[in-house]
Amino acid sequence: MGRLLIKILIIAIGISIGIGNLYVTVFYGIPVWKNSTVQAFCMTPNTNMWATTNCIPDDHDNTEVPLNITEAFEAWDNPLVKQAESNIHLLFEQTMRPCVKLSPICIKMSCVELNGTATTKATTTATTTMTTPCQNCSTEQIEGEMAEEPASNCTFAIAGYQRDVKKNYSMTWYDQELVCNNKTGSEKGSKDCYMIHCNDSVIKEACDKTYWDTLRVRYCAPAGYALLKCNDKDYRGFAPKCKNVSVVHCTRLINTTITTGIGLNGSRSENRTEIWQKGGNDNDTVIIKLNKFYNLTVRCRRPGNKTVLPVTIMAGLVFHSQKYNTRLKQAWCHFQGDWKGAWKEVREEVKKVKNLTEVSIENIHLRRIWGDPESANFWFNCQGEFFYCKMDWFINYLNNRTEDAEGTNRTCDKGKPGPGPCVQRTYVACHIRQVVNDWYTVSKKVYAPPREGHLECNSSVTALYVAIDYNNKSGPINVTLSPQVRSIWAYELGDYKLVEITPIGFAPTDVRRYTGPTREKRVPFVLGFLGFLGAAGTAMGAAATTLTVQSRHLLAGILQQQKNLLAAVEQQQQLLKLTIWGVKNLNARVTALEKYLEDQARLNSWGCAWKQVCHTTVPWKYNNTPKWDNMTWLEWERQINALEGNITQLLEEAQNQESKNLDLYQKLDDWSGFWSWFSLSTWLGYVKIGFLVIVIILGLRFAWVLWGCIRNIRQGYNPLPQIHIHSSAERPDNGGGQDRGGESSSSKLIRLQEESSTPSRINNWWLNFKSCSLRIRTWCYNICLTLLIFIRTAVGYLQYGLQQLQEAATGLAQALARAAREAWGRLGAIVRSAYRAVINSPRRVRQGLEKVLG
């Protein structure tokens, strides 16, 4: 009984020691992510040529799942914003399709100024309307104040189809696109001109007369990735801890309108004015989101029925010239809505940014900058024509001033026809240029083809892109229109964040892996995707209990996204194969597959393939332990991020060791190997080995004897032994006669003669062989005896061990039987006593009543 208690105590101690240890556990399907710069792909509801060749059709999936977490957001340093800037530039280039160099046009041209068409009546009308901003002017009134575009008709000679024969050509150019020198001694108005930018860049002509359609796109995360969205009401482009976070698959639909200074057709207009600053405090990069309550719009128009004349210069080179013989009226833009009220609210918000209570809103002024035409003017594209609108009139209207924005030293000249530079107007004059500066790449010029017919664009104004100059606490504050195009995409996409889902996590548990040969089989995957991240804000313990469902959500989402994307790609493969965005869409699909395969390869290297919770044999050696009830997986992963490298290395080493152990275990568990011991062929192999050992030993012994014989032969004959022969007088007294006892001298002589006559070498060989045989026999006998003793001892120990096990089992059975017997007896006694109490209770009650009554 004592031995049994000792054994039970040892087992209990071992179990208690094993329970106290923590081991690394791998979890697959946890809602954790990290920032990513992967290429997103685009969807669009548009069906024009560009949309169908670059984006896949919109699936109208606006699913949004809220997350109970906090996350950092930044609008400008955002990979999604950088992608949008690059992609929209590609859209520009593909829409304009520059393909033919215009280097032949970079020659001297003889130009004559075109005649004007403005009448004195129009000039008088324009002069009488200078005193009011004309908020509700008609189209005729606005066009009456517009000046005429200065243009020239230029002729030049160039070799055409016949290289040795020059041909004269005639084209019409805007004067802003020419660099001219007046001729001396020539006809009046004639001048020598060159096309601008000939010396500093390569100009290209548009092959097709395409134009810029209103295009709306949305960016979508590839499979295995997601978009986080900040929904805080006080979000201003920078939030270290956004509290109202949700996860989406795609962004909202955004417009692709490119402008400078003023944002058009934005998708984030709300009933409040907001100021966004880069990094939360950068005054040079500011977005002012305008209140949609004021209904701010802008209407832009190019008057006249403009026509285009294709001029074939040589084979493969066609230049689209402007066909008119008189000057055209300037284009114009009319700003409509309550701009005064909107600008007043903007001024109040500018004061709140720095908490400048002493500054009057009258000291906050809107300004424009100087530099390239795209920077100094309100620049945008309207149906293929690039408008350059000088904002001085409108800025004077908002600031309630009448000054020349180009400098305070200049006087406002009101003597010239038309309005001067110091008037207030709700509309501005615009120039149209055919040669423009590229807004994305430095110094590159893109040629925009002219459009025929009437042009008009109506847009909503949703933002101002500015730089704020805080001079001092009480001084004037200048709000300067900024030409930074990236602010457009920071405004549109700044509340989104592209993240990569990392569904593999590590945490310590007290469960150690069972290292048996069985493995879990692959499970089927169904359900959706965004619900997978819905558990990001829940505690680790609650999330871990639903890992199977979450991992199914993850893979199902990946497969569904891949299926949708592949179907769209297959439908448009003929169109996608030649476009840059088509390649990016395919790249997004490949990236998702690579990511999923990489995750599965990592799990497989740790022995955790197709497992949602995988226990390991690697001990947890770190002090960090999770709080399963009040810590999210995202918080835990950020806490142990520095330990991931060490943990993965230990997991790989443990898996390699487990593979080796499993291989050995399978060999021991192989019954075919066990029955092979009873095979005669197996034993014949061992017999062969033993026979070879004996033959080798005998061969070595024979070689040793042979070597001894050769050595003796080389030494020569041995000398004869000197034997003393006794005489008859010295014959020993044997107490008898000659016939009784002793050896006669004649017999000794015979033996001596025999010995002397037998060769000594043969005797040595015989003796050596006899001695060797005796030694071998003795050695074999000793080995057999030792082996027999060992076998007897092992059998004895085995019998003793079996006897002890039998006694222990018998003792345990007796103890269990005795304990069961005692427990049963006690239980029976308790039941009997309870039964007696119930049976005897009436009698005891009766006896008690008799005692009381008696």
UniProtKB/Swiss-Prot annotation:
Residues 154-198 are annotated as: V2. One of its GO terms (molecular function) is structural molecule activity. SUPFAM superfamilies: gp120 core (SSF56502), Virus ectodomain (SSF58069). One of its GO terms (cellular component) is host cell endosome membrane. Residues 586-602 are annotated as: Immunosuppression. Glycans are attached at residues 35, 68, 115, 136, 153, 168, 182, 199, 244, 255, 265, 271, 283, 295, 305, 355, 400, 409, 458, 472, 478, 630, 646. Residues 473-481 are annotated as: V5. Residues 21-705 are extracellular. The record marks 522-523 as: Cleavage. Residues 633-672 form a coiled coil. Residues 300-332 are annotated as: V3. Keywords: Apoptosis, Cleavage on pair of basic residues, Coiled coil, Disulfide bond, Fusion of virus membrane with host membrane, Glycoprotein, Host cell membrane, Host endosome, Host membrane, Host-virus interaction, Membrane, Signal, Transmembrane, Transmembrane helix, Viral attachment to host cell, Viral envelope protein, Viral penetration into host cytoplasm, Virion, Virus entry into host cell. It holds the Pfam family GP41. Residues 667-688 are annotated as: MPER. A motif (YXXL motif) lies at residues 717-720. Residues 389-430 are annotated as: V4. The chain crosses the membrane at residues 706-726. Specific enzymatic cleavages in vivo yield mature proteins. Envelope glycoproteins are synthesized as an inactive precursor that is heavily N-glycosylated and processed likely by host cell furin in the Golgi to yield the mature SU and TM proteins. The cleavage site between SU and TM requires the minimal sequence [KR]-X-[KR]-R. Some of the most genetically diverse regions of the viral genome are present in Env. They are called variable regions 1 through 5 (V1 through V5). This is Envelope glycoprotein gp160. It comes from Simian immunodeficiency virus agm.grivet (isolate AGM gr-1).
